[in-house]
């Protein structure tokens, strides 16, 4: 079994759970079709969120994908607790150092750069939406983003431009660390092309 390169952490609202809306498992299946190994974990509270973050310590995990309801100042867990950027720094520093974080959370791109004022090396880079996005927009845009990260010839800034071309100009933003802004190529070339 190949080592996981993407950790998907999802924290849905109670209404999302009731309605059967989720992103994590669907994105994991899309990634598997692309030859990328991912782990998807659903968390409902801060204790489970911390436990999931600790999985990111594995050196083969390069991308942390967080799917939760968000806003400029942070994001919300299933139990209703709000994780502000200061809280996230407290919970995730230095675990996410050297990783790339992708948020599928409404509007977090408008405030998440605060993490780099708390720690310049919090992570290598962040991709996040700057407006409210639908579940479908997030899934389609990130499916394209991760597909493109399989090529050494594509940069993260180019990949985010493609995401914006798909769902609308200015929707997603790449925020690079002032310390190290390296991103990663993932997966292996697919032998099973139909």
Question: Residue locations for each model-derived region?
Answer:
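Hydrophobic anchor at the start of a short beta-strand
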Residues: 6, 38-39, 101, 124, ...
């Amino acid at each position: 079994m190949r080592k996981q390169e993407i950790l998907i952490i999802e924290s849905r609202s109670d209404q999302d759970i009731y309605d059967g809306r989720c992103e994590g498992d669907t994105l994991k299946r899309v990634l598997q079709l692309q030859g990328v190994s991912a782990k998807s974990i659903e968390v409902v509270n801060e204790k489970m969120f911390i436990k999931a973050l600790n999985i990111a310590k594995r050196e083969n995990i390069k991308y942390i994908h967080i799917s939760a309801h968000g806003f400029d100042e942070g994001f919300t867990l299933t139990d209703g607790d709000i994780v502000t950027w200061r809280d996230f720094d407290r919970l995730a520093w230095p675990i996410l150092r050297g990783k790339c974080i992708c948020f599928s959370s409404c509007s977090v791109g408008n405030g998440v750069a605060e993490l780099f004022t708390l720690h310049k090396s919090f992570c290598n880079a962040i991709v996040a939406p700057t407006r409210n996005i639908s579940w479908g927009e997030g899934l389609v845009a990130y499916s394209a983003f991760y597909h493109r990260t399989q090529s050494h010839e594509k940069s993260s800034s180019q990949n985010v431009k493609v995401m914006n071309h798909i769902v609308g100009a200015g929707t997603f933003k790449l925020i690079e660390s002032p310390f190290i802004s390296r991103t990663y190529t993932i997966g292996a070339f697919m032998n099973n092309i139909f």
